[in-house]
């Protein structure tokens, strides 16, 4: 949890995304559930909303617990973003293992559950940044593959604010099991088809640019089969030195049948280097990545249609909401080429197709 000055100017959020299937229509949708805390040391018996005219007028920073839940859009079917706010006084927390609850919303390492019901009247208040609708979830969670970011997420670098936003990919391949009820329609979530993802971010502000890319649905060109214990995760970050921002970096891990290929500055002995490019067209976002270290090289290309993405809203600890949209979706597709260095040459390990990828981008 947030401590010290971060508790007065900081955030922590736990993200989950996964697929569910409606048993009556066989429709597949990609859902998301996020638990977040903003400036907990400033909390009172009521949530302080940074976009509310009263709190803006009095110069109060936001402080609340928030549940954000919804579904990403599909062609011909719009997405939904629901937000509900709770006071810090409603928070119950236990450690070892970590457990968090406020009202009927529960988070633990192996289960999440809760509900949101937003009326049309409530949704008309722009300060709440929410659509109207209802969402109920009750899910078992099994985090099968984690991303290891090395020393950069330890207590010292967190205390000196070496990054604007820290990341722990605690479940870059996660299996969900349970049910979701969206506006009265039930969806079943099964481990083998959930293609789930779970992570945690915390810090003093959100990354600019905001860049994220991940998939736990990898298919081998060698065998034509879906890979087990395999996943890709990429997260952008903004390092600082003596409080001055440095060149933007990415943290990348490709787990291939249980073997981790890591490309980030949290593992300095691997001599990692990463390049990336993001292109926005009228219809799509397109990503290209190339990363290498002492023992391997990976090339990644992926894209997602804007019809399957939506702008998500976030309020920063200082009470600001960016005018630049954060586009996010859950159906990115693309290719991966993975090579191993053998002497002075490269040996192809495998070519992979990926589907059902989580993708997010907000330019600076």
State what each model feature region is:
Residues 1-364:
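Structured soluble/peripheral alpha/beta segments that form catalytic or ligand/cofactor-binding pockets
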């Amino acid at each position: 949890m947030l401590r010290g000055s971060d508790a007065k100017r900081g955030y922590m959020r736990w993200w989950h995304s996964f697929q569910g299937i409606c048993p009556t229509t066989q429709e597949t949708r990609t859902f998301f559930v996020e638990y977040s805390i903003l400036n907990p040391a400033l909390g009172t018996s009521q949530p302080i909303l940074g976009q509310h005219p009263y709190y803006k007028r009095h110069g109060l920073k936001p402080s609340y617990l928030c549940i954000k839940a919804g579904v990403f859009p599909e062609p011909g079917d719009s997405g939904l973003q629901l937000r509900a706010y709770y006071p810090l006084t409603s928070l119950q927390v236990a450690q070892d293992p970590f457990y968090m609850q406020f009202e009927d919303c529960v988070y633990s390492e192996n289960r999440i559950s809760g509900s949101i019901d937003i009326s049309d009247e409530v949704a008309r208040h722009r300060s709440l940044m929410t659509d109207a609708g209802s969402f109920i979830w009750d899910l078992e969670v099994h985090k099968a593959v984690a991303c290891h970011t090395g020393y950069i997420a330890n207590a010292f670098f967190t205390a000196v604010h070496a990054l604007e936003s820290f990341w722990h990919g605690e479940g870059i391949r996660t299996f969900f099991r349970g049910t979701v009820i969206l506006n009265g329609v039930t969806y079943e979530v099964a481990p083998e088809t959930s293609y789930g993802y779970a992570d945690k971010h915390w810090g003093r502000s959100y990354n600019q640019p905001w860049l994220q890319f991940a998939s736990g649905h990898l298919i081998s060109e060698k065998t034509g089969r879906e890979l087990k214990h395999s996943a890709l995760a990429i997260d952008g970050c903004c390092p600082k030195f003596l409080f001055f921002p440095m060149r933007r970096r990415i943290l990348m891990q490709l787990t291939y049948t249980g073997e981790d290929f890591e490309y980030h500055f949290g593992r300095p002995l691997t001599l990692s280097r990463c390049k990336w490019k993001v292109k926005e067209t009228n219809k799509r976002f397109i990503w290209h990545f190339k990363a290498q270290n002492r023992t391997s090289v990976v090339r990644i290309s992926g894209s997602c249609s804007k019809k399957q993405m939506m702008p998500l809203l976030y309020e920063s600890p200082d009470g600001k909401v960016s005018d630049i949209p954060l586009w996010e979706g859950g159906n990115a597709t693309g290719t991966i080429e993975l090579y191993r260095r053998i002497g002075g040459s490269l040996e192809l390990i495998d070519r992979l197709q990926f589907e059902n990828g989580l993708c997010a981008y907000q330019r600076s």
